[in-house]
Amino acid sequence: MKIILTADVTGLGESGDIVEVKDGYARNLLLPRGLAIVATKGAQKQVETIRRTQEAKRVRNLEHAQELKQQLQGLGAVTLTAKVSKQGKLFGSITAADIVSAVRKAGGPNLDKRSVDTRGHIKSLGKHAVDVRLHPDVKASVSVQISAAS
């Protein structure tokens, strides 16, 4: 029986693939669990339409991520001020939310704090490199300058 997978099935294929399986496997496992639909001409056309829209969306997301990367590279170093002790140690640490806020104030794009990777906690003054995951294929690096608040 020819079926169209609606979800990724280990050992069989990915969502949208048209595969040939035994009738019992399709009727007793794949179809009742919603992992596949019977391959008809209408369903195949619908799958092709969905694939085209997903591909177009993937390309748009990649282009948008490239634009964000260009904006971040044009920013240069982003400056943050924080309270420090007499020994020069920060009270607390600089978080991803602090970095996102500083990037926005510096005229950069609005980022998601979950996309910022600080490589651990930033607890010292000076210049730090921070990675930003904009897309699975696009990463940018932002330079963050931490200075003492007066």
UniProtKB/Swiss-Prot annotation:
PROSITE patterns membership: RIBOSOMAL_L9
Database matches in Gene3D superfamilies: Ribosomal protein L9, C-terminal domain (3.10.430.100), Ribosomal protein L9, N-terminal domain (3.40.5.10)
Keywords: Ribonucleoprotein, Ribosomal protein, RNA-binding, rRNA-binding
The organism's place on the tree of life at top rank: Bacteria
InterPro entries: Ribosomal_bL9, Ribosomal_bL9/RNase_H1_N, Ribosomal_bL9_bac/chp, Ribosomal_bL9_C, Ribosomal_bL9_C_sf, Ribosomal_bL9_N, Ribosomal_bL9_N_sf
GO molecular function ontology, one term from the record: structural constituent of ribosome
Gene Ontology cellular component list: ribonucleoprotein complex; ribosome
GO annotation (BP), single: translation
SUPFAM superfamilies in UniProt: L9 N-domain-like (SSF55658), Ribosomal protein L9 C-domain (SSF55653)
PANTHER family reported in the protein's UniProt record: 50S RIBOSOMAL PROTEIN L9
HAMAP family the UniProt entry points to: Ribosomal_bL9
Family: Belongs to the bacterial ribosomal protein bL9 family.
Stored NCBIfam families: L9
Physiological role: Binds to the 23S rRNA.
Protein name: Large ribosomal subunit protein bL9
